[in-house]
Amino acid sequence: MSADCPSFPVSTSGLLAAWPRLLRLPTQHPAGFYLVCIAVFCERWAAYMLGSSLVLMLCERYGYSRADALRLAGIVNAATYLGTLPGGIASDRAGHPARWLGASMGLLAVGYAALVLTAPAALWLALGLLLVGHALFKPNTQAAIASQYPVGDSRLDAAQILFYIAVNAGATLGSTVAGLLIHRTGWSVAFETAAVVMLVGLLALILGHKVLRLRPATMQHLGPDVAKLGTSPPALRAKLIGALILAMVLYTIGCGQVEGSLLLWAQDRTNRALLGTEIPATWFVGLPAVLVMLLAPVQLGFLRQLQRRIATPRLVAWGLCAVALAFAALLPAALGHTEQRASMGWLVACLTLLAIGELLVAPLGLSLLLRLAPPRFIGALVGAWYVSRALGFWLAAEIGVLWIGGSPVAMLALLMGLSLAGAVMLWWASRDTFKRRDQNC
């Protein structure tokens, strides 16, 4: 455990500071880092209880058409990412990311509790609270983690992988529990559970506030270190940054189908029978998170070897190729008899390839952006990154609407083409910037 983290042997904070060692977790990380992981685990659990079933809830509970439900789900996803820019600016000005985390978790708990009510007005109130809560929560998780480490600390790389595992563990449990509760008890109990999960995370933050002390000296972000990394001419770096952000839009269009079109594919076109029972469609939404959680430690072990052979931009490009292959895996099922449900193996293959693509695109893409960005523009470019995710989710919903009335084969071909276009664009943009190895990224 970091020497910066105090030990309080008899207090609640002392117990929280000691629990990573008791659970045999890597003790080189501060206890405050693990506390943030608990918070994001709870937030993702609750978020996926709604996200994995939002389209179905809008159709079954509120009478939306599938097209309108997909559009609203896309708007909600987009607004969640767009809100992080003003949310991050507000928290930067006020400071104390741990306090903002606590406030955002309280808003999220109230938002999920409001979904227990069935009135349409309660739906809009809940969505509003959830959007504000997520706008504050997302940027402050990274700020809170950064506050636990000295600037340039080499442990941050491993910390981000562990953080990513916590994110996907919460997402996995959320979609799994949602499928069970909605199928057996209905929507209200599922959202009551989501609210309770958020309150548990908030309680952990309150009890452990002493190990989440803000260290102002570590809140200088990565400016001096980033300035040493990119030695390519500014014009070439700007070209790669632009290609990376555009590629992120195209990647998000593909991965954004999981909670929309692929959820409906699982519901309507997939034979979900297994051992005498039927697997809930929402479980397929959580499968990529399970796979990411399992594969992330493998990625951590092999990443340095991969980067010695392949430049980081091209690793991201290979991730986009994996997304294209994911939709190619569904082509045999789409070309089969429409009156028969397809084997779930095709959908599982698709989701597995999407998980591999996610591991290569999401963490490596953001890391590459931070390394290429001029120090004074890091905040703006990270905001542009999230805006690209928002645009991608909106376009994903629009493509999902076209999928309802169009040819599945044509939609799969479109999604394959968009992902491959992103890969080619990154490959082209990096050909001059990274001619040999990824030494500067």
Question: Where are each of the predicted segments found?
Answer:
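Pair of pore-lining "gating" transmembrane helices in MFS-fold secondary transporters
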Residues: 25-60, 237-258, 352, 356
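Central cavity-lining transmembrane alpha-helices of secondary-active solute carriers
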Residues: 71-89, 286-299
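Structural signature of the two symmetry-related core transmembrane helices
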Residues: 99-114, 314-329
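Helix-loop junctions at membrane interfaces in 12-TM secondary transporters
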Residues: 116-127, 332-348
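Intracellular juxtamembrane helix-capping segments at the cytosolic ends
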Residues: 136-150, 360-373
